UniProtKB/Swiss-Prot annotation:
Originating gene: thf1
UniProt xrefs under Pfam families: ThylakoidFormat (PF11264)
UniProt keywords, alphabetically: Coiled coil
Entry GO terms, CC: plasma membrane-derived thylakoid photosystem II
Task performed by this protein: May be involved in photosynthetic membrane biogenesis.
Composition bias, Polar residues: 222-235
Region (Disordered): 213-235
Record-stated family: Belongs to the THF1 family.
Protein's UniProt keywords contain Iron-sulfur: no
Protein's name in the database: Protein Thf1
GO process terms (BP): photosystem II assembly
Coiled coil: 183-204
Matching InterPro entries: Thf1
Amino acid sequence: MNNVRTVSDTKRTFYNLHTRPINTIYRRVVEELMVEMHLLSVNIDFSYNPIYALGVVTTFDRFMQGYEPERDQESIFNALCRAIEQDPQHYRQDAERLQAIAKGLPVKDLIGWLGQTTYLDRDADLQAQLQAIANNPNFKYNRLFAIGVFSLLEQSDPELVKDEKQLTEALKAIAAGLHVSDDKLNKDLELYRSNLDKMAQALVVMADMLSADRKKREQRKQQSTAPVAPPSSNE
């Protein structure tokens, strides 16, 4: 019998692959995503699909925006995927393929396709995946899949995802066609967008703190290098 990998195993592998320290504000993001991906990877009902991959890539790219040094972002993403014994290039390629499809489709056609009321010949693999999801009573719905759906809609029509009514209607149609809970879709995406806002606010606060600290250091440096006036002859 094969031993199921634990979260500790995955974390150990990750930190062996990416050995440089991760900035504090981003470490929680990386570890939460790592745990989420790990738990799905060991779930018997979970199977990889390109919409999930798009959700992983979107989540990572959005929450890691502004990470310094920028060159470490690729190393962190690669380690994240390899820690759960997955190929990072596979995730990236599937995500890019789906983004390109969504950009080339009117959003109504995309919603119909995702909701399985319209059949398009744009991508046979995605069509097969959508049908497999809709026909699988044990499909393991997850937050990253929801983010993948949201990312597709956003790529097709950025304005639609800003309109709560239109977004809710789109998610309802997609959920009905794929036989997943539209309530879960909406709640997961509300939390996702809320967390993005919180992350953006935290980055602003951090930037302000760094700027203030830099100014203080510059002031101290100027004071330490300022010439000391000699005592006057009257003293």
